[in-house]
From Swiss-Prot:
Entry GO CC: plasma membrane
Any GO MF annotation of the entry: sodium:proton antiporter activity
Gene: nhaA1
Name this protein carries in UniProt: Na(+)/H(+) antiporter NhaA 1
Residues that span the membrane, as ranges: 15-35, 42-62, 65-85, 101-121, 129-149, 160-180, 183-203, 219-241, 265-285, 299-319, 335-355, 370-390
First-listed, main subcellular location of the protein, grouped into a coarse class: membrane
Length: 397
């Protein structure tokens, strides 16, 4: 389509960015672990507990720095996810039903099976069961970054399969957060949020293409959603769906412009900051029994085994029932490798974990992070090895 940046260039830039940011995410997580397990641990905890307040008239928002990161910065991350989902649905791979069936089926399996495994392991503990959604998430930056390390050894169709699967997985995570991880609701704030949403929709329908007005109303929407009891990050998704992809003269795309501007900030600043703030697990007093506790065990097994069985299993079923075909040029070994890579939950799992087990108010807050880091690490290493070996055999064949 004329006026819109070609899908191929967006796709190439996307993978280049995610591959580089994945290394930064790892560095941020490792740095957090080192600092929080050193004599400087008091600085780490103290920094995240620093109170930050914003007051405008009667409106007062006071939170520790950690919650500003999780509720504020991550709203921009979800804004970017929403922009990517809308672009793919309107003018990308999610706009063609035939191309959606396989990754959508795989994504469903990759959410249901890990959740069932976690529930089964923690079924006798109602408080621990609250973390059932933690192993259902996939970190799109890490998963695509690891796959990008294989370069041209994997077909583009396989990368598209993983990207589409991860986007659908993110959409599923958004729905889960909205339905299961919202607090006590405020009817007044919800009505104000609905009014903001109506204004955004009206602006879209009236052909407003300047991003400024959308950002201003979006900020007000975020405040209303924050005060409503619904998780504030969902305001980013709602705003994204109202940003126009196309304009009447087709000379520019507000959505693509915003996506282009946000991508480096999210990849190189927001996600690393989030990883640093949430990955600092204290290893003091940790033993083998700590890893075999039902919470970290459920998360680790859910990510590593559940994702693999769910994604690979339902992909196999869809292909055998002739509902869809394998990505062009990809073999079953590569599909298995990608299924394992989907077990890299990291940032998304950490985010869901912060909702299920709030830091400072839940005894499982550190345990969930331990399971996430363990499961994600082994999923990355094993997934890379399996995909690399399968790609070598495919190339030889």
């Amino acid at each position: 389509m004329e006026g819109l940046q070609p899908v191929r260039s967006l796709f190439t830039r996307f993978f280049q960015l995610e591959a580089a940011s994945g290394l930064l995410l790892i560095a941020a997580a490792v740095l957090a672990l080192i600092i929080n397990n050193s004599p400087l641990s008091y600085l780490y905890g103290g920094l995240l507990d620093v109170p930050v307040a914003v007051q405008v008239g009667a409106l007062n928002i006071a939170k520790p720095l950690l919650l500003w990161i999780n509720d504020g910065l991550m709203a921009l991350f979800f804004l970017l996810i929403g922009l990517e989902v809308k672009r793919e649905v309107v003018d990308g791979h999610l706009s063609k039903p035939s191309q959606v069936i396989l990754p959508a089926t795989a994504a469903v399996g990759g959410m249901v099976v890990p959740a069932l495994i976690y529930w089964f392991i923690n079924r006798d503990n109602p408080a621990a069961v609250a973390g059932w959604a933690i192993p259902t998430a996939t970190d799109i930056a890490f998963a695509l970054g690891v796959l990008a390390l294989l370069g041209k050894r994997v077909p583009v169709s396989l990368k598209l399969f993983l990207m589409t699967l991860a986007i659908i997985d993110d959409l599923g995570a958004i729905i889960v957060i909205a339905l299961f991880y919202s607090g006590t609701l405020s009817s007044v704030s919800l009505l104000l949020a609905a009014a903001c949403l109506l204004v955004l929709v009206a602006m879209n329908r009236l052909g407003v293409i300047k991003l400024g007005p959308y950002m201003i109303v979006g900020l007000i929407l975020w405040v209303c959603v924050l005060k409503s009891g619904v998780h504030a990050t969902l305001a980013g998704v709602a705003l994204a769906f109202c940003i126009p992809l196309r304009t009447r003269n087709a000379e520019s795309s507000p959505l693509l412009a915003l996506e282009h501007a946000l991508h480096p900030w999210v990849a190189y600043a927001i996600l690393p900051i989030f990883a640093f703030a949430n990955a600092g697990v204290s290893l003091a007093g940790m033993t083998v029994d700590s890893f075999t506790h039902p919470v970290p065990m459920g998360i680790t097994v859910g990510l590593l085994l559940g994702k693999t069985v769910g994604v690979f299993g339902l992909t196999w079923v869809a292909v055998k029932l002739r509902l869809a075909a394998l990505p062009a040029g990809a073999g079953w070994g590569q599909i298995l490798g990608v299924a394992i890579l989907c077990g890299i939950g990291f940032t998304m799992s950490l985010f869901v974990g912060s909702l299920a087990f709030a830091p400072g108010s839940s005894e499982y807050a550190g345990m969930d992070r331990m399971g996430i880091l363990t499961g994600s690490f082994f999923a990355a290493v094993i997934g890379y090895a399996v995909t690399a070996m399968a790609s070598r055999k495919t190339n030889v064949a």
